[in-house]
Amino acid sequence: MPGPSQGTTIARVMCMKSVAAPARDVVHGYVSPGFGPVREAFAENFAEHRELGGACCVYHRGKKVVDLWGGVRNKQSEPWEQDTMVVVHSATKGLSAMTLAVAHSRGWLDYEERIATYWPEFAQKGKDRITVRQLLAHQAGLFALEEPVDRRVIADLDRLAVVLARQTPAWEPGTRQAYHALTLGFYEGELLRRIDPRHRSLGQFFQEEIASRLGEDVYLRLPDEIPNSRLATLSPPTPLRMLTGFPLRATVEFLNRRSNIYRALVINPGSSVYIDEERVYARNLEVPSGCGVGTARGIAHAYGVFAAGGRELELRQQTLDLLAAPAIPPTRGFYDECMKGDGVQFSLGFMKSTPAWPFGSARSFGSPGAGGAMGFADPDAGIGYGYVTSQMGTELTGDPRDVALRDALYSALQL
């Protein structure tokens, strides 16, 4: 498939009128020949799916074949530019998992090893037998923190490590799955600090060993020098859309202060900890399960490397084969004690494609984010995909804008 330098179709598609996007908004960017359906789906999202502003990028077998952006990036209706970045919430989890995959390829980490081998203090409170694989599959029973944790604790990695080490699993590790909405990244971060010879934070490692190597704008620790003018602000769904869009059971769980998902996502520290009213997003703070900020281009490029052999990041084939392998269930099955369903499966820090929520081939791995963001690698098709948006949707999985783009992509590939 030819890349953009070998014959690019420039997309200057006027968006149709809609509530979310004024008619003057333009979709910018390009698609390589044969990928026109993706451009059309991106434009239609503004008219059909209340898109406000966003971007979509696709790498195919190492070549960038789709790079689109459009709409507006804030309530002042300033345009979404080529280099606009936005927080991607839990799509960050896939980026964090990439850091551990790089560490695995370097021989620093064994997914089957007990975490306490690398981090001895972790062994207390019945955590001595938890393996790296179990943690990354949300099977460690550590989905919530039992003591107050705020931005000050998160910013002090040594202090945070002490808090993490003294947590008690909610049940016997390896028996159940429960979405570690925010805690997963904290545990990953300390694990990486223990195995990295330079003891870098997860955000620093990602920046130096992945984002900078690829020349892309994606951050797990947003630096001070990034101006607000490069950042898109999130537009939440209306109260009516939230009431009608979220599954009733999920709404009830989110409102119940004793529920697992409330404890995992709403408090201690809560998903709003990385939002800053004056600076859009908190700077120099790492919440590796949710505070990633970047472009669709950066996300797609990183996944594209994982989908096409990993040469740029010196990934071993053994690592890539493990990421593509099926998820291993806990002893009680894939029913998730936080999300109250069994349609989602995790493996080695990534979400896996399942019949209940498919993306790409069965060997694909990636991570969606609250509101609609998505990134994944499909090693069978050689696809690295990234989609980001400022208009938050209400679907827990399978945002219709993302689905429309992926359907158009695989239609273009005739897969």
Where on the chain are the PLM-derived regions?
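Flexible glycine/proline-enriched surface loops and loop-helix/loop-strand junctions
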Residues: 81-83, 167-174, 185-189, 279-288
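Active-site helix/loop module of the DD-peptidase/beta-lactamase fold
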Residues: 82, 87-91, 105-147, 165-166, ...
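Active-site-proximal alpha-helical segments within enzyme catalytic domains
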Residues: 138, 183-191, 290-311, 373-390
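Short, conserved catalytic-motif segment at the N-terminal edge
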Residues: 27-88, 110-113
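Active-site SXXK
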Residues: 36, 42-43, 62, 84-113, ...
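Active-site Gly/Thr loop motif
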Residues: 236-296, 325-380, 415
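Short, gly/Ser/Thr-rich active-site loops of penicillin-recognizing serine hydrolases
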Residues: 308-311, 324-335, 395-415
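Low-acidity, Ser/Thr- and Arg-rich intrinsically disordered low-complexity segments
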Residues: 5-8
